Amino acid sequence: MFGWEFPPHIAGGLGTASYGLTRGLAKHGIEVIFVVPKAYGDEDQRFVRVVNASEIETPFGDTREQDVWEKLTFIHIDSNMVPYVAPEEFDSYAEEYRRTGRTILDKEGWTERYSFSGKYGANLMEEVARYAMVAAQVARDLAGQFDLIHAHDWLTYYAGIAAKRVSGKPLVVHMHATEFDRSGEHVNPQVYDIERAGMTEADRVIAVSNLTRNSVIEKYGIPASKGVTVHNAVRFSTKDARPQERGVSDKIVTFLGRITYQKGPDYFVEAAAKVLRKTRNVRFVMAGSGDMLKHIVRRVAKLGIADRFHFTGFLKGDEVQRMFALSDVYVMPSVSEPFGISPLEAMRSNVPVIISKQSGVAEVLDYAIKVDYWDVDALADAIYGLVEYPALAEMATEKGLGEVTNLKWENAAGEVANVYRSLL
């Protein structure tokens, strides 16, 4: 199984879902080798074997991955950038490079480990391509130790393809979010091409919701017979009890997620302003980070609600649980959400939730309040109702907890196991 992140080092729902699924598969007697670009050594390996791609020796002499390499596009600067050398030494370096025709990306000489950051930085595309090269070597090193390949999201699709071509094993790709979900209609063509290539090469495509499955069929041209929906789930914990004292009497309404277009943070802010015109006994918390953060901060200031609005930055692990424990209402106003695990985590923590109708999780929840992401008035009314009418909040909390209790990773893993069996 190829992933890009694994707890406790995660940036969002992808790592959480990978963790939950691998735990669930273990309960079905399925052994999982989870390959990640960078492992830190503190991963929970009681039910999964974690392989650190940064420790894999990868000779590049084999030409079986040449087609992957040839798909890469690099912009070269016509300069040999060698630090800390005298001018005459630099001239010597430059002449040697010109004479031999060598480049920094000399694939024939790549025989050492590639140190992945495992992040989502400026060199992400290069890391995705390198990960595919390492994946091919992993498939060789582990020959005879696996029966099937499972790749999570576009970051690992090239890796899955490379491993399949080396091993001949069936490939399952897991679509957690499409490029259309992340970017609207302004898609990155490179990401789109990778997603389409992965799903085209795959023997089966798992989508996290019917919403995502339909998108895969309609926007990527993937045959309906190849796609199957397996909804995400939530892992229960003993740390989810609400505290008796919070230190504030105001109601707390929380947005937790990446502060990006996809998650609809601007709609949360506009709804907050409308609620605060009706009552001042409420505080709004935006927990997360992202490219829209500065814009959101400026908008909060312009609306004059900064004294009622709090930014926590990115939260992880126990910090997330503490935030839910402090919350009276959780809001997920996503513009396009393939699934959305965070509402399940909130309901698990006895917090009533409001979600957008444009989310996959809406397919499995009957006791969450659902609004169109763009309907700020409806969102504001829903928030106001939950903070001002205790009976409504209590009913949503009680019914929601009962509903989410049945959404277990063990059940989702059972459906994934059935997909595996259909290919073996």
Show the residue positions of the predicted features.
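A conserved catalytic-core segment of Leloir-type glycosyltransferases
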Residues: F34-A139
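Carbohydrate-associated surface elements
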Residues: L211, A233
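Nucleotide-activated donor-binding/catalytic signature segment of Leloir-type glycosyltransferases, i.e.
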Residues: H295-L315
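Aromatic "clamp/platform" in nucleotide-sugar-dependent glycosyltransferases that forms part
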Residues: V335
